Every structure is written in C-alpha cells, then in structure tokens.
C-alpha cells in the first residue's frame, strides 16, 4: 500500500485564526481530516506532521526516507524562502513532493517570491486557498497510482 506524508511548517498550526483574510477559516485539523479520508478511500496510508522547529521537519523527512514513504505534500511556510537545509533534506531522501502554498506567494512581498524548493518539486500549487491541498493530493494519487517508490 502506498504511503503519503503531509508536512506543514511554521505557523500553519494557526490556520483558522491567523489572518483569515489570507489563509481562510479552515484549521489544519480540518485539512488533515479531509486528506486522510481521501487517502483511505484511495487505499493509501496517510500521515501528517506540523512543526515550528526546522530541525524537527528535517528529522521527519529523514524518517520518511527510512520508512519508505512514497510521496510528500509539503507546505513549508516561511522556510520556502530561507531553508537550504530543507531543500537538501528533500533531495537527500529522494521522495517526490509537491510544494503547497495557501496564498499566492507571487502576489505578496518580494521576499516571498523565491522558493528554494520549487525547482526540485514535482509541482507547486499556490494561491488556491486550502483547496490547494486537495489538488496536490489528487496529483499525488494520480502519480502514485500504485507504483512503488522510485518509479514516479
């Protein structure tokens, strides 16, 4: 059975209360529940992890590599624009991933327009609100389509 991991970076635990005009009113728990249900229906194992500590996210990526996780969906939050270490961790484990952003980072401050992950991601979804998570999941499920890791 394929396995998918959802990763969320700093401040995403505040979804539902943090700047709802930008990020909406859905909580991270709402998003995780919906994605988990969709994965169950598709016969895919699902797990989720959120942290405000960069080293913890990197450790979780390393663990995913050892565990044979097949695909990662990641909203790296502000680490998108700052973390070469996160990029190196994702490259190091070789798990395909899709980068997700709730807001349109290209319509915001100039410093948010640089991603250290986009060029090594399978794809990037930005600016479609929390619906972007479900779109990323649909793409990941289609890409997995029961194929073993390394054949994506």
From Swiss-Prot:
One Gene Ontology molecular-function label? 3-dehydroquinate dehydratase activity
The gene it comes from is aroQ
What InterPro entries does the entry give? DHquinase_II, DHquinase_II_CS, DHquinase_II_sf
Protein name per UniProt? 3-dehydroquinate dehydratase
**What is annotated about its quaternary structure and interactions?**
Homododecamer.
The record's CDD domains line, in alphabetical order, gives:
DHQase_II
Taxonomic superkingdom: Bacteria
Instruction: Describe the task this protein carries out.
Output: Catalyzes a trans-dehydration via an enolate intermediate.
* Catalytic reaction annotation: 3-dehydroquinate = 3-dehydroshikimate + H2O
């Amino acid at each position: 059975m394929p396995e998918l991991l959802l990763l969320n970076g700093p401040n995403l635990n505040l979804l539902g209360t943090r700047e709802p005009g930008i990020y909406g009113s859905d909580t991270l728990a709402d998003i995780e529940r919906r994605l988990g249900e969709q994965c169950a229906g598709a016969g895919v194992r699902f797990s989720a992890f959120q942290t405000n500590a960069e080293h913890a996210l990197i450790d979780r990526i390393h663990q995913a590599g050892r565990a044979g996780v097949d695909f990662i969906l990641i909203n790296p939050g502000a680490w998108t624009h700052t973390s070469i270490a996160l990029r190196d961790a994702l490259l190091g484990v070789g798990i395909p991933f899709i980068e997700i952003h709730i807001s349109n980072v290209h319509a915001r401050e100039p410093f948010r327009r640089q991603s250290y992950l986009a060029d090594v991601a399978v794809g990037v979804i930005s600016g479609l609100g929390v619906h972007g998570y479900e779109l990323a999941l649909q793409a990941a499920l289609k890409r997995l389509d029961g194929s073993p890791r390394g054949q994506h």
